[in-house]
Amino acid sequence: MSTRHDRIWVGIDAGKGHHWAVAVDADGETLFSTKVINDEAQVLTLIETAREREEVRWAVDISGRASTLLLALLVAHGQNVVYVPGRTVNRMSGAYKGEGKTDAKDARVIADQARMRRDFAPLDRPPELVTTLRLLTNHRADLIADRVRLINRLRDLLTGICPALERAFDYSAAKGPVVMLTEYQTPAALRRTGVKRLTTWLGRRKVRDADTVAAKAIEAARTQQVVLPGEKRATKLVCDLAHQLLALDERIKDNDREIRETFRTDDRAEIIESMPGMGPVLGAEFVAIVGDLSGYKDAGRLASHAGLAPVPRDSGRRTGNYHRPQRYNRRLRWLFYMSAQTAMMRPGPSRDYYLKKRGEGLLHTQALLSLARRRVDVLWAMLRDKRLFTPAPPVTQTA
């Protein structure tokens, strides 16, 4: 049986190219401090060195892609690993001697925190489905960010060619105007083409409401006769950006299709999608973040992770002062907020609850957040009981 001194804690300051590992014993004495290249052979050597003691507990400050190899090897060798948030490391570093910041010091802080605290979340190797959904949803977020950048650049260039044409359409929501910009970018070109020919040209490219798009474009073109400086070069850039935007939309569609197909291989997909406002994309985001829900004891813990459970800020006689937490998963909060907003727009219990909160004097955003918190409880109960969503609670239906 191991004694108190047979147990060690290894803190790892993880990085992309290399990690730094520091081991401490139960008395807080440093046993070793070493640099470890992010390579299988060196990580295995570190594991074997640490396992010379009877019991080893590991702690890392990064749970993302940089530590994937490290975590996979630790889990494969049956090691216990916990996650020490970077915010904790940053705050606790100030309690140590000296103002310097090094990888070795951070690793020592991580090891000490793991030694003194028992409430850090354990890390395990996620299922292949969860890993795949994380990759796909992260890639989708990158594609959406690229799309926003392209649209902003496109609108900026159009303003320098014809401000009226830039104002005429919502290029982020309609495909037709973007298709038009692949061929016609200037007021003069649009006026020469005319409404009839432009409608025919758009119709051949299967643009929805081609006549409306053509009429609005020609109307905007007729408001400007002057040629602005740099128009010749700007038109080429607009044409190029329009082609890029159309190609990017196809990539997003392909990615969404893959997300949908992958998500629906999960046994919980049907349950999650049965809840109003939770489509395949938001459902995939949910599974990618929470995994199998084993890290949450109850719905309150899940709501806390999503930043939907207020935390107290009491002092002395000042009590009942609640505010939004600072540490929570932004994407998880976003998906519950968006699903609540979608569900609120349709008749049903979500809209009834939203209107009830509005009647109590809450602002729109406050009522939506309150609804999102309520829906966390509902989704948790659905997954726990493995049942689909029903407008009325099960007890009411039975009665």
Curated annotation (Swiss-Prot):
InterPro entries named among the record's database cross-references: Transp_IS110-like_N, Transpos_IS110, Transposase_20
**Which family would the database say this protein is a member of?**
Belongs to the transposase IS1111A/IS1328/IS1533 family.
Q: Its Gene Ontology biological processes? A: DNA transposition
Which organism was this protein described from?
Streptomyces clavuligerus
An example Gene Ontology molecular-function term: DNA binding
Q: What is this protein called?
A: Insertion element IS116 uncharacterized 44.8 kDa protein
Which intervals of the chain form a coiled coil?
A: none
Keywords, A to Z, come to:
Transposable element
